[in-house]
A protein has these predicted regions:
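SAM/dcSAM-binding transferase cores
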Residues: 114-158
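Short amphipathic alpha-helical segments
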Residues: 24, 42-45, 91-94
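Conserved Class I SAM-dependent methyltransferase catalytic core
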Residues: 57-108, 113-115, 119
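Mobile active-site "lid"/loop adjacent to the S-adenosyl-L-methionine
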Residues: 28, 34-63
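Glycine/Thr-rich phosphate-binding loops of Rossmann-like dinucleotide-binding domains
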Residues: 19, 40, 88
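Short, glycine/acidic-enriched loop or turn micro-motifs at the edges of active sites
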Residues: 17, 36, 124
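S-adenosyl-L-methionine
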Residues: 1-28
């Protein structure tokens, strides 16, 4: 962790276990890639792990946002990627949990596509001002990764 081992603690656990860590209002940053689809709106397949990752079977958007808010200290930052179709619901849940959206980046497969994902940066007890970034396009015209995505993967800024 670039010499920050004594300051960085990564917890990779199920959301239902967060209370075991005694971290209420103590965390600086929470990253989350929760399931995008409501259980009622999707077809459940045979692969249980895949279903849990994609569908709100063991948690839901409200719980994810509530837990993140509970963990974060004031001015702590919450990063989340989610389905762009649920933006209105996401914004309402974040606001309800005192998380102010500070940055939005829409993500689309190809240049001509509508965005299908959204990357959100929210701040606990933050002020109401939001920066909207240019969309990230995942693939170029030939199907290869776009230059922006190549830069992200190579850890260069875009």
């Amino acid at each position: 962790f670039n010499g920050l081992d004594d300051k960085v603690k990564i917890i990779n656990d199920e959301i239902k276990n967060y209370a075991n860590y005694s971290l209420k209002n103590k965390v600086d940053v929470v990253y989350c890639n929760p399931p995008y689809s409501k259980k009622e709106s999707a077809i459940i397949g045979d692969n249980e792990s895949r279903n849990i990752a994609r569908l709100e079977l063991t948690t839901n958007l409200g719980e994810v946002v509530d837990v993140a808010s509970g963990l974060l200290k004031p001015n702590g930052v919450f990063y989340m990627v989610h389905d762009a179709k649920r933006l209105q619901e996401i914004m309402a849940k974040l606001s309800l949990c005192k998380l102010a959206v500070k940055e939005l980046t829409f993500i689309k497969g190809k240049e001509q596509d509508c965005p299908h994902l959204i990357f959100i940066k929210a701040v606990k007890c933050g002020k109401e001002e939001c920066k909207i970034h240019l969309p990230i396009v995942l693939n170029g015209e030939n199907g290869e990764l776009s230059d922006a995505v190549k830069c992200l993967y190579s850890k260069k800024s875009i």
